[in-house]
């Protein structure tokens, strides 16, 4: 069984730690998978974590190092497209008001 920390939350919502890279690493170290919200900026080739807006900048190396434990919620179509061009086993998905969502794995 896999336990997934939604945005890095372990005990209910906590906006102060949601999608924070340090919190995500902590959850993974504690044995959890983590769902993260990601946006890709094609101008800078950087990735941003954040539910409603970009908040925490990370790079591809950071994502790749944790990819086996991440459930990557692509927050827009451009981010979905970028992840779909990668062949390194990322588990990503996109949805917008759907009854069901499929991931890439």
PLM region spans:
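Phosphate-group recognition and catalysis centered on beta-loop-alpha active-site segments
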Residues: 1-105
């Amino acid at each position: 069984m896999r336990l997934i920390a939604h945005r890095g939350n372990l005990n209910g919502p906590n906006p102060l730690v949601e999608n924070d890279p340090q919190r995500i690493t902590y959850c993974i170290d504690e044995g959890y998978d983590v769902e993260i919200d990601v946006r890709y900026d094609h101008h800078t080739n950087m990735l941003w974590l954040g539910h409603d807006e970009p908040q925490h900048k990370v790079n591809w190396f950071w994502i790749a190092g944790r990819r086996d434990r991440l459930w990557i919620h692509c927050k827009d179509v451009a981010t979905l497209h970028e992840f779909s061009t990668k062949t390194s086993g990322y588990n990503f998905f996109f949805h917008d008001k759907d009854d069901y969502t499929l991931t890439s794995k």
